[in-house]
């Protein structure tokens, strides 16, 4: 995992904002993918790792769910019909009740341009698909551990 401002890295996971700012007061994670089976598989993985996780396949329900449930992290697919992950990230960043959440892009779109768009939209991290459980868990566990340790 890399933390820097670059979108040029060949790493499979990039983190652009220090994870400590997400402040995981709990281990709630919202997973969003229009492919329901993918969202549910990721949900099961995260639950097995001790996270409280909800999965959505409807991008139009994300902002309301995030405001109501207050997850510390939202994992978003980028390409979804009707409302893509980039626009969702912008909307979550624009709302005072969701602007602090850790936003993780999980997507097959991993070119330099794709990463730059994700960063500009407000994502904190980018995990390239095909996603292995370890990739996402590295980001989420780091965020949760940093909260337990307190701000650096």
Predicted regions and their residues:
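Non-catalytic signal-transmission and effector/linker regions of two-component phosphorelay proteins
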Residues: 1-30, 43, 134-152
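Receiver (REC) domain active-site loop signature in two-component systems and cognate sites
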Residues: 80
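Active-site beta3 strand of CheY-like receiver
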Residues: 69-75
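Short hydrophobic/Thr-rich beta-strand motif most characteristic of the beta2 strand and flanking loop
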Residues: 50-58, 62-65
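Charged docking surfaces used in two-component/phosphorelay signaling
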Residues: 40-48
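A Lys-centered signature of the CheY-like receiver
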Residues: 129
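Hydrophobic/aromatic residues positioned on beta-strands within the core alpha/beta folds
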Residues: 104-106
């Amino acid at each position: 995992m890399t933390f820097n401002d670059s979108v040029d890295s060949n790493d499979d996971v990039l983190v652009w904002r220090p994870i400590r700012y997400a402040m995981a007061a709990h281990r709630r994670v919202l997973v969003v993918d229009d492919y329901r089976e993918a969202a549910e598989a990721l949900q099961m993985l995260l639950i097995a790792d001790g996270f409280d996780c909800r999965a959505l396949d409807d991008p139009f329900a994300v902002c309301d769910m995030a405001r109501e449930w207050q997850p510390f992290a939202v994992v978003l697919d980028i390409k979804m019909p009707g409302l893509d992950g980039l626009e969702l990230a912008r909307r979550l960043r624009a709302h005072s009740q969701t602007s602090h959440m850790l936003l993780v892009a999980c997507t097959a779109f991993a070119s330099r341009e794709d990463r730059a768009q994700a960063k500009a939209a407000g994502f904190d991290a980018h995990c390239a698909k095909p996603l292995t459980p370890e990739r996402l868990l590295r980001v989420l566990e780091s965020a949760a551990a940093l909260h337990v340790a307190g701000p650096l």
